[in-house]
Structures are given as C-alpha cells and as structure tokens.
Amino acid sequence: MTPTRNLIKRAPGMPEADVFEMTWEFFGELCRVLAVKVATAGYRPDLVVGIAKAGVIPGAVVASILRCDFYSLKISRDLGAERVRARPKIFSAAPKEAMGKNVLIVDEICTSGETLRLAQNALRQVKPADLRTATSLVKQGGYKPDFYALETDATVIFPWDRQVVNDAGEIVTNPLYEGL
C-alpha cells in the first residue's frame, strides 16, 4: 500500500458506530497516513514521544517512517485489576532530549484530550522548540490533536488488545471485549 491515501474517512466495512476490530494491516495504514499528514503539513519533528503504553505502538511506527528518534512517556488511567482512575496520571519523566527540539507526541486514540494535554504540559517543562500532537484515531466530537488519521464513533478494538494471556498461560479473548 502506498501512503497516498492520506484522507481515510472510514475503514472499509467500518460501521458508523458500534464496534470496529482493527487489523494489523489497517493499523499500519493509519500510521502511514498519520506520517504523511505530518510531513505534508511541513512539520519536521526531531523526535516522536509515544504515550505509553498503547501510544508507543503507533509512535514508534510513525517515528520510523519519519526517520526520527523515538522516546516514550508513561501516562495511564490504569489501576490494575480492571480498575481505572478518573483522570490520567504521569508515571515517568518527559525525555530531556526534547529540549530545543521539534517534538511530535503520539497516542493511539484521542477522546477528551486529557492525556495529550498532560503530555504537552510535561514536555513543555523541558522546553522543546515546538510541540505538536498526533493520534491514529480521534473520537467524533472530541478534542482534536494537530494531526490524526481517522475520526470515528466506534468502540475500537486494537489488534494488540484483542487477545491476552490468562492465568493458565493461554491466549484468550480479552475479557474487556467479551460480548461485543
């Protein structure tokens, strides 16, 4: 596939709402689209910061396509055992390598923008030259990052979340998605 399809409106067969199970192939296309949008906008990041944990996946791919360095910043709502906190929290320091550089923050999806704003605030502390945000997906009607590949109302099941290892060491459907 070529990255010329930089205006994906909807995935083939993707519903307007409900649930969309993303394939690895389609995820790769979203990363290519995102990188092309960044490049065609004239933005040249020196480094990409992926928001851990799921944002490191598109972040690393986009950094590779754009041929720039990659770092991560851990921000999470996860409290373990299927519990989540109301607001995201930072668990690692912003990379000091961002000082004086053009930085692209990447996450897998944006709904409220809380995580992206938290990442921006953390990175501003190390004084980058410029700071932009990008996500593979954005929820319709929500906060819009500087760049995104696809807008959707669907509940998205990412390929890395579809299956997990249970206590018996078996690969099983992620309990979060049972019944969807």
Give residue ranges: language-model regions.
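Conserved PRPP/pyrophosphate-binding segment of the phosphoribosyltransferase/PRPP-pathway fold
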Residues: E29-A81
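Active-site-facing substrate-recognition patch
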Residues: M1-R44
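Glycine-rich phosphate-binding loop signature in dinucleotide/nucleotide-binding domains
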Residues: V38-R44, E97-M99, V126-K127
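Conserved glycine-rich SAM-binding loop
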Residues: A54, T111, T115
